[in-house]
Amino acid sequence: MEANGSQGTSGSANDSQHDPGKMFIGGLSWQTSPDSLRDYFSKFGEIRECMVMRDPTTKRSRGFGFVTFADPASVDKVLGQPHHELDSKTIDPKVAFPRRAQPKMVTRTKKIFVGGLSANTVVEDVKQYFEQFGKVEDAMLMFDKTTNRHRGFGFVTFENEDVVEKVCEIHFHEINNKMVECKKAQPKEVMFPPGTRGRARGLPYTMDAFMLGMGMLGYPNFVATYGRGYPGFAPSYGYQFPGFPAAAYGPVAAAAVAAARGSGSNPARPGGFPGANSPGPVADLYGPASQDSGVGNYISAASPQPGSGFGHGIAGPLIATAFTNGYH
């Protein structure tokens, strides 16, 4: 059978729950069919489902597939064999794990991001301005540790979430004769989903290229501050990039992590910002989740992620100055 970019011999691919008997098979030959894949792995145990993923347009194999054993012990047998070859090509079987759901964007919050502040604006100016909308619990500006000058952006926390709605509805505000932009602050979990946060500490100097690519020249180094783990920043927050869909946060974070690992910049893209079609995590590289609701929720264990095209950052560490001293 052939449907939704896959070709299999039995079973259903619509079950997104983790199946301990399910394996991701990478490195398949273009000639490998579900039948030949089944024939090879049947020597390890009874196979409940077998499929080769295909491009929905060209119908060509995408070079990977899935095999689900009736007995999870068969997976150990496969992994216990150091070398696997099928159709004169070395293949790479791995345990398939469900892909975690991406955190949703926060719609109700007490904290806002304020960007585009003038150089002479101090934290008291920011607090005084926003108090006209409601009680301010805290206000802070982000400072460069080297120059001890603020970088043109900060955060304000209100006592009431409704105040945030009112402030962000206006969007642009004038403080000290300069228009500033206000956005809802987003938890770090949105910026760096679980599994990438451990490497997020390496991002400050690689994400600058991304920030510049998004046109955020007015307040660079934002991610260098939030996600750096400075004392008192609990929870950390990120800025909701203008015009950037929430669904894209996962691939961007993955690409940034790949950049932190040492990927070079993309010479075809000035500023180091990846193209619109740059691949995301391995599941996106092999095909969008929409092709198959069950398969799209799986990734292979320890499979590499593609490079991102992010360049190196340009600025140094930041520190925060807050209206209250709870952040120092």
From Swiss-Prot:
Superkingdom of this protein's organism: Eukaryota
Gene behind this protein: MSI2
CDD domains, A to Z: RRM1_MSI2, RRM2_MSI
InterPro entries xrefs: MSI_RRM2, Nucleotide-bd_a/b_plait_sf, RBD_domain_sf, RRM_dom
Subcellular location, record wording: Cytoplasm
UniProt protein name: RNA-binding protein Musashi homolog 2
Modified residues (Omega-N-methylarginine): R228, R261
Gene Ontology molecular-function annotations: identical protein binding; mRNA binding; poly(U) RNA binding; RNA binding
Keywords noted in UniProt: Acetylation, Chromosomal rearrangement, Cytoplasm, Methylation, Phosphoprotein, Repeat, RNA-binding, Ubl conjugation
Entry's Gene Ontology BP terms: central nervous system development; regulation of translation; stem cell development
Post-translational modification: Phosphorylated. Ubiquitinated by the RHOBTB2-CUL3-RBX1 ubiquitin ligase complex.
